[in-house]
């Protein structure tokens, strides 16, 4: 493990040189004026004011982190001279999560988009606007998750099993980001609009708001490891949930088979990543207080609700905004239960088509049809692979 001094040096370098730090310090007044699609000046001004508000909210949330935290007391974080070798496995539950992630590997080339363009051209303008902007958010968000994994979690966590998972998660987030980029490249033929969507963090205040919240946790020097685990569980478990649900709504209508299949694969992966965050939280000795956890989750819920009911309302594709807001609260409650906090919203799932989707911190989705898409034998016991002559034919 690197010394504490080296970690401090690395964090100082991050604060000066990281691309995410540059994004965080950009003034929202410098958001470029765009005239593409539905981005009218009035809406842009409205969203910009909202972004300014969340910037202050996120910063104030960071400043509230005053709970003493000693990394040397945490088995996950203390120096581990055996971190360069994998065996013998010390944390079998963490290792099994890594093997499950490894078994679920897939590539962009395995998703067939040949039938999507026909549906794309049949969609209404509002529907195309909504889908393209959701894809723009996704394309940027996976890069932000990786920024956190590379700059913070992978450097802080010292147990080999967790490092294996984070390494594989980084690879899968790259696949997700590539998938969303390919989808945008396939559906959007206008090069100027493509550029606008690929730069969503700078061009779309609604996306910037969510990005700034996540990035502020990466760059924070006051938030402890436990709080940041909660924040990124919220990013992958709450920030993605409504957008996943909106794309599954299209599947319910029999539209865009390539988009909806990739959404199944990615939502399964993100469900597993959220599960892993919960598992890491359970291994912590110094956990954030219940009130602090609720505060972080409530903040994430408010941002996601605003995103899909105001900035990019789901009624553009025929969904009910009130039900979407309720669904986000339902997802947050399921995450809070996994964290041992208990429900605070007590809302039911309003979308029956989402019953089996792993956005709630559970891995049951991994077991259903799309979850069977896994590498053969990766999660099985090697001792089960025995040659025999007494098999029935």
From Swiss-Prot:
Residues bearing PTM Phosphoserine: 18
According to the UniProt entry, its GO molecular function terms are:
metal ion binding; ribonucleoside-diphosphate reductase activity, thioredoxin disulfide as acceptor
List, separated by semicolons, the cofactors it needs: Fe cation
Biological process terms in GO annotation: deoxyribonucleotide biosynthetic process
| EC number(s) stated in the UniProt entry for this protein | 1.17.4.1
Subcellular localization, as worded in the UniProt entry: Cytoplasm
Q: Kindly state which keywords UniProt assigns to this record, in alphabetical order.
A: Cytoplasm, Deoxyribonucleotide synthesis, Iron, Metal-binding, Oxidoreductase, Phosphoprotein
Protein name (record): Ribonucleoside-diphosphate reductase subunit M2
């Amino acid at each position: 493990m690197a010394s504490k001094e080296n970690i401090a040096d690395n964090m100082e370098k991050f604060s000066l040189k990281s691309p995410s730090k540059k994004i965080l310090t950009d003034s929202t007044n410098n958001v470029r004026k765009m005239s593409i699609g539905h981005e009218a000046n009035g809406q842009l001004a409205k969203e910009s004011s909202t972004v300014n508000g969340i910037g202050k909210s996120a910063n104030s949330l960071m400043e509230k982190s005053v709970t003493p935290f000693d990394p040397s007391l945490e088995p996950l974080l203390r120096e581990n001279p055996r971190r360069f070798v994998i065996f013998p496995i010390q944390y079998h539950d963490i290792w099994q999560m890594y093997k499950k992630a490894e078994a679920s590997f897939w590539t962009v080339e395995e998703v067939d988009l040949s039938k999507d363009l026909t549906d794309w051209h049949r969609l209404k303008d509002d529907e195309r606007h909504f889908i393209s902007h959701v894809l723009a958010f996704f394309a940027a968000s996976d890069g932000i998750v990786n920024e956190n994994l590379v700059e913070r979690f992978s450097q802080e966590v010292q147990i080999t099993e967790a490092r294996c998972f984070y390494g594989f998660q980084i690879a899968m987030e790259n696949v997700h980001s590539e998938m969303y980029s390919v989808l945008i490249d396939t559906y959007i033929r206008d090069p100027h609009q493509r550029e606008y969507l690929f730069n969503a963090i700078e061009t779309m205040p609604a996306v910037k708001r969510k990005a700034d919240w996540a990035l502020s946790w990466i760059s924070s020097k006051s938030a402890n490891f436990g709080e940041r685990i909660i924040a990124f569980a919220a990013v992958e478990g709450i920030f993605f949930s409504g957008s996943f649900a909106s794309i599954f709504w299209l599947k319910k209508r029999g539209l865009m088979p390539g988009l909806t299949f990739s959404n199944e694969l990615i939502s399964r992966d993100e469900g597993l990543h959220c599960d892993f965050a919960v598992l890491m939280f359970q291994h912590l000795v110094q956990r954030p207080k219940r009130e602090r956890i609720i505060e972080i989750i409530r903040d994430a819920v408010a941002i996601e609700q605003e995103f899909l009911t105001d900035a990019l309302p789901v009624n553009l594709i025929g969904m009910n905004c009130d039900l979407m807001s309720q669904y986000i609260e339902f997802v947050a409650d399921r995450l809070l239960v996994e964290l041992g906090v208990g429900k605070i919203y007590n809302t039911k799932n309003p979308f029956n088509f989402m019953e089996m989707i792993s956005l709630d911190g559970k891995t049951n989705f991994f077991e259903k049809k799309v979850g069977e898409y896994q590498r053969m034998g990766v999660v099985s016991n090697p001792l089960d692979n025995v040659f025999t002559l007494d098999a029935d034919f």
